[in-house]
Amino acid sequence: MNSPRQRQIVMALVTLVTVGSTLLVATANSQAVAPEPERWVGSWSAALTPAGAGKSKDGFSDQTIRMFVHTSVGGSQARIRLSNRYGTKPLTIGHATLALPWPEAGPGDLKPGSVVDAAFNGQKSVTIPAGGSAVSDPVAMHVPASQDIAVTLYLPAQTPGPATWHLYARETAYIGAGDHATSATGAKLAETRNNWYYLTGLDVLNRSGQGSIVVLGDSITDGLKTTVNADRRWTDYLGARLVKEAPEGRAPGILNAGLSGNRLTLDGADLGVNELGMNGSSRFHFDVLGQTGVRTVILALGINDVWLSQDSADNIIARIQQLASLARQAGLKVIVCTLSPWNAFESAPGVVAYTPTLDSVRLTVNSYLRTSTDFDGVIDFDAALRDPANPTKLRAEWDSGDHIHPNDAGNEAMAKAIPLDLLLEDDEDED
């Protein structure tokens, strides 16, 4: 029979093992249920360009601009990013607010009680130097996913052009004299435009842990020919699909950096059209690397280099490789998109831009994109959109009518054709 001393030692060992096991179980359970820390991530963005005509050229004076943006992911707080990148003089924002829209009440109206001020270093106003940018303080506001948010800016002083802007917003902006940043009604904002001014991003704070995905593209990404005020760009459909289908709701933000007419090789200014923006390489730093939480870039440029610049396949491929190299150096995942069909596209009424010779360049580029090991993945928009009976043409039901830009249904088909596993981060890849 064991001595009392031996029994005490045995009991102490049993207790130690039991407590240790309990701690191990508790630690394991704690790891399993520990919430992802909140991080800032881009939910919406717009690529900005130098001024063109109208308001972008003339500027503003003692006026309010109310703009609407469509989120991809939601969050518990928000902040806005503003830019005076192409301005030649300081830009003063006298008052900025965020709110939920209330379109059933009237054009430009806001949901009562939803308007919140956006401060800058604790101040109501901010002055942004020429070529500069600003980020607001965090705004305590629940931001829903895949929903519109109203951003209202009041410009108190004479603000001459050129105004940094985005030409084809596909969203109505409302403009009026005086400070109406906190007004829930749009009644005094009677002037309308289809542009975004100075506003380049909306960030949210959330726990997705998936960061953001930037799409560097042209007019197809920009949503040209989609329904105005309906948010039917392929990136909008993709954002909504990810929110719905991503495991545990952990969707990345989708940031649209599309510019109509944009090219890999040349700027819009080379055509005398500033609002087409800088070429893809020149704007890569601002429009991709400058985004909040960016982890992946989708390259969706090249078709304008085929028909507008009439560049060679070798040059187009070299430019895509250059962009991929820039992304890799920044630690980003790189996905490319094949160039979609464009047979019968007219560059002007009665002027058919398409030729089989030019299309052979597109096909050569696509062959490279499908087979190259230079990228982390390929989205085959050519295969998704082409007419099986005539592969050089868009499917009729997805053609907006100009034979190069997909309609709303075509944009939805593009989003559905994307394998989501290309876009979602594995747990072991997260920071």
In which residue ranges do the predicted regions lie?
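Conserved SGNH/GDSL esterase-like catalytic core that processes O-acyl groups on lipids
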Residues: 44, 66-67, 90, 98-105, ...
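Proline-centered loop/turn at the N-terminus of a beta-strand
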Residues: 253, 333-335, 377
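Structural motif
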Residues: 88, 194, 205, 289, ...
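Active-site segments of SGNH/GDSL-like serine hydrolases
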Residues: 300-307, 324-362
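Active-site-proximal beta-strand/loop segments in catalytic clefts of secreted hydrolases
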Residues: 83, 154, 216-219, 256-262, ...
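Catalytic His-Asp segment of secreted/periplasmic serine-dependent ester chemistry enzymes
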Residues: 271-273, 340-429
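N-terminal secretory targeting modules
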Residues: 2-216, 221-230, 247-249, 426-427, ...
